[in-house]
UniProtKB/Swiss-Prot annotation:
Membrane topology: Multi-pass membrane protein
Protein name: ATP-dependent zinc metalloprotease FtsH
Lineage: Bacteria, Bacillati, Bacillota, Bacilli, Bacillales
Source organism per UniProt: Staphylococcus haemolyticus (strain JCSC1435)
Extracellular side: 28-110
Biased composition (Basic and acidic residues): 645-684, 691-706
Length: 727
């Protein structure tokens, strides 16, 4: 944009200079004094004029010359004023000291006439093209007309090369992408096996989980060209531009094959066609159609691998997700506790941390945080430390940053009455006591009555470990914990406030999900009741969200939700009445301390004593021999490849062992059969036929009396040692 503005400014300055020179040449550089007709006649009559020149021009006579004081002057005489013109001419001729001339009308040159006509047209055309190119995002200069050119940027792997070891908390996702790296490095072994590498890989996951970073790591490991573009860069105000940019993108990719094309937020262009409001957008549909053809159409895109990222796979067009286009979908989820610790090490490598900082403990306190959330957490902690003039980031800074990220900045200057503080303290104490009693699912980490964001206070409840499933008792405990604040207000003040609205919203949502989604209602049974539209209106889906159950079922669902909430309300009330002493003690302590951490809460609840927490006394022993100290935060390409080769070798060893065991067993059976056959022949040679048959039966109970057992109604088994064809 700045370059385009400079170009326009230079052109404008050049135009002004040319116009000024042209005006100077035509006007000889002098600006004469303009006289009215009466002033001119008066000076002529007085004899004040030294020279006089009359020249016809268009509809007037131009009068110019010099006065006796050597001042330039000019005036005009209208064409229809012939009488005055004749009078002025006679008067000028009669004056002896006056140099009088009459010139013929000068015809304007063709060049000047064309220039005068074309300059406004050229200026308007230039401004039109410039603003049009700006609307298209093409910039100025030589890119003005490049509407259909791709906006993809080619990433240079040599400047900021990202490796698999730089990506933390996504080891399984890297294992899924390892074949892409191998194919870009050397595709001979895949061709020998007749394999077809996936043409496209769709990275699906919540925002901030590292989908773009994984794509860059694939390009960095393979050393291949990496084209990066956003899905919104294809669709513009003109129809056909998006399809043209798709064609140009693949043409550039073919010139640099093998390479990677990465489309971020592909749902902007890959939304399902003709669905919902805005679904029938012609430009987007044309762009998507061109993308589908380029990925898997009549043309061959050998060596081009598409990687796309989205957090809304449900709205993508089915044609985009079929095999041959995006063959593989990789779920990039939020990291577990080990992944969060590795990510914290990645983002803390350029930050001075105090000895009190325990990144493992922080990872345990941040369940559900994505990589972007953890980076923001440490950045907030560094800003807090810098604001307070510290040289290092300590654990208190990280605790404060965690509270800011979860609940917002503290509103310590907010004026709150004593009554409101008392209500908030008992409200949060109710949550805390329920959390201490029902700690199967979650435990209390911190409780505060300092206002943050929209909340007057909050209790931080953390799960004991990362959870992927929740049982019915755990969900009921969660509802009970959410109701603890309102029940505590009711018990202590016999009146309720508006502070529990968010608690009710969350509790009701959990109860409704238990009934309609999880099948946890004994009355309605293990059924799922959902709307046909998926429960939400989105521009890529139909807006109709009609329920697929009757009004009577809807009434029963509401009754079941009410029953669950009422039962947990009464259960919560009984728990708080049984622990009323602890409830009042925690509320009283909150009014004086304002914030309590887990260690203090446990001591108050079990011992009735408030301990002092010394953050500076904690020292974390760091393992200098760990991979983090060597700058390795995740499994590298070599580590993953070595693990896969080792797994392959282990499978081969197990298969070989199985084959050896089977061969050994077959040889044993064959030897036993030969021994039995030899004994049978000896007995038959030394006795008559009847005795032979009798003795044969005594040696082999399964012998039928035939030299070869008949193979009647028995399927052929190649491993059967009793089958003569296998001997």
């Amino acid at each position: 944009m700045q370059k385009a503005f400079r170009n326009v400014l230079v052109i404008a300055i050049i135009g002004v200079i040319i116009f000024g020179v042209f005006s100077y040449i035509n006007g000889n550089g002098n600006t004469p004094k303009q006289l009215s007709y009466s002033q001119f006649v008066e000076k002529l009559d007085k004899g004040d004029l030294k020279t006089l020149e009359i020249q016809p021009e268009q509809n007037v006579y131009l009068v110019s010359g010099k006065t006796k004081n050597d001042e330039d002057y000019s005036s005009t005489i209208l064409y229809n004023n012939e009488k005055d013109l004749q009078k002025i001419t006679n008067e000028a001729k009669s004056q002896k000291g006056l140099d009088f001339k009459v010139k013929e009308e000068e015809k304007q040159s063709v060049f000047v006439s064309m220039l005068t006509t074309l300059i406004p047209v050229l200026i308007i055309a230039f401004l039109f093209i410039f603003f049009l190119s700006q609307a298209q995002g093409g910039g100025g200069g030589g890119r003005m007309m490049n509407f259909g050119k791709s906006k993809a940027k080619m990433y240079d792997n040599q400047k900021r090369r990202v490796r698999f070891s730089d990506v933390a908390g996504a080891d399984e996702e890297k294992q899924e992408l390892i074949e892409i790296v191998d194919f870009l490095k050397d595709n001979k072994k895949f061709k020998q096996m007749g394999s077809r590498i996936p043409k496209g890989v769709l990275l699906v996951g919540p925002p901030g989980t590292g989908k773009t970073l994984l794509a860059r790591a694939v390009a960095g490991e393979a050393g291949a060209p990496f084209f990066s573009i956003s899905g919104s860069d294809f669709v513009e105000m003109f129809v056909g531009v998006g399809a043209s940019r798709v064609r140009d993108l693949f043409e550039n990719a073919k010139k640099n094959a093998p390479c990677i094309i990465f489309i971020d937020e592909i749902d902007a262009v890959g939304r399902q066609r003709g669905a919902g409001v805005g679904g029938g957008h012609d430009e987007r549909e044309q762009t998507l159609n061109q993308l589908l053809v380029e990925m898997d159409g009549f043309g061959e895109n050998e060596g081009i691998i598409m990687i796309a990222a989205t957090n809304r796979p449900d709205i993508l067009d089915p044609a985009l997700l079929r095999p041959g286009r995006f063959d593989r979908q990789i779920q990039v989820g939020r990291p577990d506790v080990k992944g969060r610790e590795a990510i914290l090490h990645v983002h803390s490598k350029n930050k001075p941390l105090d000895e009190t900082v325990d990144l493992k403990a922080i990872s345990q306190r941040t369940p559900g945080f994505s990589g972007a959330d953890l980076e923001n957490l440490l950045n907030e902690a560094s800003l807090i430390a810098a604001r307070e003039g510290k040289n290092k980031i300590d654990m208190r800074d990280i605790e404060e940053a965690t509270d800011r990220v979860i609940a917002g900045p503290a509103k310590k200057s907010r004026v709150i009455s004593d009554k409101e503080r008392n209500i908030v303290a008992h409200h949060e104490a109710g949550h805390t006591v329920i959390g201490m009693v029902l700690d199967e699912a979650e435990v209390v980490h911190k409780v505060t009555i300092v206002p943050r964001g929209q909340a007057g206070g909050y209790a931080m409840m953390l799960p004991k470990q990362d959870r992927f499933l929740m049982t019915e008792p755990e969900l009921l405990d969660k509802i009970c914990g959410l109701l603890g604040g309102r029940v505590s207000e009711d018990i202590n003040f016999h009146e309720v406030s508006t502070g529990a609205s968010n608690d009710f919203e969350r509790a009701t949502q959990i109860a409704r999900s238990m009934v309609t989604e999880y099948g946890m209602s004994k009355k309605l049974g293990p059924l799922q009741f959902s709307s046909s539209g998926g429960g939400q209106v989105f521009l890529g889906k139909d807006m109709q969200g009609e329920p697929n159950y009757s009004g009577q079922i809807a009434y029963e669902i509401d009754k079941e939700v009410q029953r669950i909430i009422k039962e947990q309300y009464e259960r919560c009330k009984q728990i708080l009445l049984d622990h009323e002493k602890e409830l009042k003690l925690i509320a009283k302590t909150l009014l004086t301390e304002e914030t309590l951490v887990a260690e203090q809460i446990r001591s108050l609840f079990y011992d009735g004593v408030l301990p002092e927490v010394d953050y500076d006394a904690a020292r974390v022993v760091k393992d200098e021999d760990s991979d983090y100290s060597e700058g390795k935060y995740g499994k590298s390409y070599d580590d993953i490849r070595e693990e896969q080769l080792e797994e392959g070798k282990e499978d081969m060893r197990e298969d070989r062992k199985e084959d050896n065991d089977m061969n050994r067993e077959r040889r044993h059976r064959q030897r036993d059969d030969r021994d039995n056959q030899t004994g049978h022949d000896q007995l038959r040679d030394g006795s008559n036929g009847d005795n032979d048959q009798h003795r044969g039966h005594s040696n082999n109970e399964e012998d039928t009396g035939h030299e070869q057992s008949p193979n009647i109604d028995k399927p052929y088994n190649p491993n059967d040692p009793n089958n003569p064809s296998n001997r």
